[in-house]
Amino acid sequence: MEKSNMIWSILLHLGSNMWAKKERELCSPVYKDYDDDFVYRDHMHCDREVWRKVTEFLPECGINTVIVDIGDGVVLDSHPEIAIDGAWTKDELRADIKRMRNLGLEVIPKCNFSCGHSAWMKEYAYMVGTETYYKFCDDVVSEIIELFDTPRFFHLGLEEEDADAQKNQPIAIVRAPAIKMRDALRLFNVCISRGTRPWIWTDQRTIDAFGGDEAFRSQMPREVLHSVWYYGIIRDTEGVLETNSAAKAFKKLADWGMQQVPTCSTWSWHLNAKDVVRICSKYIDENSIKGYMMAPWQLTHKNKYYSLLNAAYTLGVAREMYYGKD
C-alpha cells in the first residue's frame, strides 16, 4: 500500500446506543443514573459544536478519514421509528458530510449489526432471524449507502456477539456460527451490490463466533475489510508475532490474503497507537495494511472534547514516526 493512499481514520459517534439496551440497569445497577458513555439514552448526546471542532482538527493531525457511528442518530426515511429525540435529519447529515469532505476528509458510515451492539435497532434487535429483521437491515444499509453517495466502505461492526459480552444485558442473543456467517454474507452482498466494500471488526473472538479459523478463512469474501482491535501494550520483543494476541491476528489476516485497518485506542494505554503502528509497519505485509483506525470510545460531547483531540493527535504522531509526515 502506497503511503499516499493509506487510511488514517478516527471513529466518532453520532448516535450513542450501541452498547446498553433499555433495562440494562436491572442487570447492572452501576449503570443506573451513571454518567457513562455506555448507558442507554433516549435523546441525542452528540454535541454539534464538539463534532465540528473535532473534525476540523483532524487534517492538522494527518487524519484523512472519519468513520461516523450512526446508530439511531439520524432520522431515516425507511425506519424513522428508531431515531432518538434530537436525531439529525438526513439533510443535516448530508450537509455535514459535504462540510467534512471539503476539509479533505473521507467520510465512512458505520452501523453495528452485532447482536451484542444492537440497542440502536430498538424492537428489531429482538427479531433476529425473521424476514422483518432482514428487511430492516437491508433498508438501513441501502439508505445509508445512498445518503453517503456510495462510500468506499461501510463498517458493519459484527463483534462481541457471545454470551460473555452480553452478560449485563437484559436479553442476550447469540447466533450459531453458521447463522452468523449467513447473516453477515447477506449484509456484505447488500454493500457489494451497491458498490461499497464491507468493513468489520475482526479479533480472534469474532473469528471464533463465525466458526473458527477455517470457516472464516474459507467463507469470508476478500472484498471485506477487517479491523483487529487491540488497546493494550505491545512490546516489540523477539517472538511478538507468536506471543501477542493482536500481533498474531494481524499476521493471520495477512497470511490469509485479507486487507485490514488495524485499530488502536487511547482507552486503556496512551501509547497504544504507537505500539500498533510500529508492530504492523515492521512485521506485517504492507499489501495487507490498508491503513489504521483510532477508536477513542469517547462520545462526541463537551466532557470528552480534549480526549478526542488527544486521540486524533496520538495517531498522527504514530503516523509521522513510522510512515513519515507526508
Where on the chain are the PLM-derived regions?
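N-terminal amphipathic alpha-helix/helix-capping segment at the start of soluble metabolic enzymes
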Residues: 1-9
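Aromatic-lined carbohydrate-binding surfaces of glycoside hydrolases
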Residues: 11-225
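Active-site-adjacent beta->alpha loops and helix N-cap segments on the catalytic face
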Residues: 90, 243-244
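Charged, low-complexity C-terminal accessory regions
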Residues: 117, 151, 155, 164-168, ...
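Glycine-enriched alpha-helix->loop->beta-strand junction motifs that scaffold or abut catalytic
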Residues: 195-197, 219-225, 254-260, 286-289
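Substrate-binding cleft of secreted/luminal carbohydrate-active enzymes
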Residues: 256-326
